[in-house]
């Protein structure tokens, strides 16, 4: 991990997204509250990212959570993935599906768009079955991903 490319939001409304974790007391589960709307990340424009970020990086990692946040972030992230890949950077992606952010159909449609650019792929067995409609053993499901896309699966 490098800090060579920090970006600062200079706008007067700049703010960092944050989350709050509330412990649960049995039988209530813990609760996480996300406060990320209108954060600087939500207003990131692809043209604000210096070209050197793509060419100097060795690995770029992102998740399905990022893609699920909203359409602007999704398209910016997809374009970043393409630019990192074009620059020869290793692209790592963790599906990390969250049903409270988008549907399985939405996730599948979007993620299938980026898989041709992904080198390292993380996907749970449940997500492979429910979101990508894969069948068979965990090994067979991951093999099917590698037969369809140029990825190295690390988890199922």
Annotate each PLM feature.
Residues 1-64:
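Conserved N-terminal subdomain of the carbohydrate kinase-like
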Residues 87-95:
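Short beta-strand/loop segments at the ligand-binding rim of alpha/beta enzyme cores
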Residues 42-49, 75-79, 105-110:
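Active-site glycine-rich loop that binds ribose-phosphate moieties when present
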Residues 87, 101-156:
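Conserved phosphate/ATP/ADP-binding segment of small-molecule kinases
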Residues 66-75, 103, 131-134:
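Glycine/threonine-rich flexible loop motifs
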Residues 37, 65, 96-100, 126:
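Active-site beta-loop-alpha junctions enriched in small/polar residues
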Residues 78-85, 146:
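Surface-exposed amphipathic alpha-helices with a cationic face
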